[in-house]
C-alpha cells in the first residue's frame, strides 16, 4: 500500500463514515491503524478513541494521532469539534475502536453523532467485532465497510445494510481476508489485510499495562 491518503484503491481519506468489522485477530484494527498512519503522514488531524490499547501485528496507533481512552474524553472532544464548526479545507478523521462502547443500542445519547458530525467535516472510522451490537442508525451512516471474518448472522446484517445478499455474506473469509463494500453499489473488492500491509499476523502482541 502506498503512503498516499488520496489513494483511490484504499479510500483512506474518503469524506464519508467507514466501518471496519471482524472477529478478534482477523486484521480489522491492523487495517484501521495503517489507514490512520497514512492520514497522519498526509498531515490530516486524526483522533482515536481506544479504551484498550492492544498492539496489533502492525503496531500501535501512529505518533501524531491524539489518543482518547474514556467515553468522557470522547464526548468532550466531539463537543469541541462540533462547536468549532469545521473547516472544509481541514477535515478531521476520528477512529473509534470498540465502537459498540460508544454507538451501542443503549447509547442513545450518541446516535446523533454519526448522522450530524460530518456537517462539521468530521468523519468517523468505526471499528467493531460485532456489527449487530452497533445501533442500525449508526451502521447505516457508513458509506464503506471493510468486512473481515464474521459470524454468519453478523455478515448477513452488514451485507443487508449495504445492499448485498447471500452472494457476499456466504463468502468464506480466512484470517486477514477482507471484503470492501460500498453503499449503493454492487461492486466489491477483496484483499488480504496482512498481505496488503506486509506484516506477520502471528507476531506477538502486547497489551498496555
Place the predicted regions along the sequence by residue.
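Conserved P-loop NTPase motor module
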Residues: 1-22, 31, 40, 44, ...
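Short secondary-structure boundary/capping segments
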Residues: 10, 136, 170-171
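Flexible, charged surface loops at secondary-structure boundaries
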Residues: 11-14, 40-43, 60-62, 81-90, ...
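Conserved P-loop NTPase motor cores
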Residues: 18-36, 68-166
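Walker A/P-loop NTP-binding active-site region of P-loop NTPases
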Residues: 25-67
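A structural signal for isolated positions on well-ordered beta-strands in alpha/beta enzyme cores
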Residues: 47, 123-125, 179
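Conserved C-terminal "switch" segment of AAA+ ATPases
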Residues: 166-175
